[in-house]
């Protein structure tokens, strides 16, 4: 049981790091080319959706394994 929660904490940490890296790249790209901010925004939303989807699958598996 404790190992399941530890794995969930690691998955949550991975999601946080991935979202931080995504936002870092977005801000760097927006600083270089402000004209493409609308395109970057749609890609950012899609990227965050995939990252959060991976976390939710991990969360469901942790409850199923429990």
UniProtKB/Swiss-Prot annotation:
Function, in words: F(1)F(0) ATP synthase produces ATP from ADP in the presence of a proton or sodium gradient. F-type ATPases consist of two structural domains, F(1) containing the extramembraneous catalytic core and F(0) containing the membrane proton channel, linked together by a central stalk and a peripheral stalk. During catalysis, ATP synthesis in the catalytic domain of F(1) is coupled via a rotary mechanism of the central stalk subunits to proton translocation. Key component of the F(0) channel; it plays a direct role in translocation across the membrane. A homomeric c-ring of between 10-14 subunits forms the central stalk rotor element with the F(1) delta and epsilon subunits.
Q: What is this protein called?
A: ATP synthase subunit c
Q: Which UniProt keywords apply?
A: ATP synthesis, Cell membrane, CF(0), Hydrogen ion transport, Ion transport, Lipid-binding, Membrane, Transmembrane, Transmembrane helix, Transport
Family matches, as CDD domains:
ATP-synt_Fo_c
GO cellular component, alphabetical, reads: plasma membrane; proton-transporting ATP synthase complex; proton-transporting two-sector ATPase complex, proton-transporting domain
Q: Give the UniProt family note.
A: Belongs to the ATPase C chain family.
| KW Nucleotidyltransferase (keyword) present | no
Q: Does the keyword Amino-acid biosynthesis apply?
A: no
Its primary localisation, in coarse terms, equals membrane
Q: Which InterPro entries match?
A: ATP_synth_F0_csu, ATP_synth_F0_csu_DDCD_BS, ATP_synth_F0_csu_sf, ATPase_proteolipid_c-like_dom, F/V-ATP_Csub_sf
Task: Give its localization.
Answer: Cell membrane
- Membrane topology value: Multi-pass membrane protein
Q: Which residues form the signal peptide?
A: none
Q: Which GO terms describe its molecular function?
A: lipid binding; proton-transporting ATP synthase activity, rotational mechanism
Membrane-spanning segments: 3-23, 45-65
Further remark:
M222 is an optochin-resistant (OptR) strain produced by interspecies recombination between S.pneumoniae and S.oralis.
Residues under site feature: Reversibly protonated during proton transport: 52
Q: How does it assemble?
A: F-type ATPases have 2 components, F(1) - the catalytic core - and F(0) - the membrane proton channel. F(1) has five subunits: alpha(3), beta(3), gamma(1), delta(1), epsilon(1). F(0) has three main subunits: a(1), b(2) and c(10-14). The alpha and beta chains form an alternating ring which encloses part of the gamma chain. F(1) is attached to F(0) by a central stalk formed by the gamma and epsilon chains, while a peripheral stalk is formed by the delta and b chains.
């Amino acid at each position: 049981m404790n190992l399941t929660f530890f794995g969930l904490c690691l998955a949550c940490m991975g999601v946080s790091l991935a979202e931080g890296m995504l936002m870092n790249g977005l801000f760097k790209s927006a600083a270089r080319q402000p004209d493409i901010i609308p395109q970057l925004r749609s890609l950012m939303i899609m990227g965050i959706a995939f990252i959060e989807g991976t976390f939710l699958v991990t969360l469901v598996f942790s409850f199923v394994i429990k």
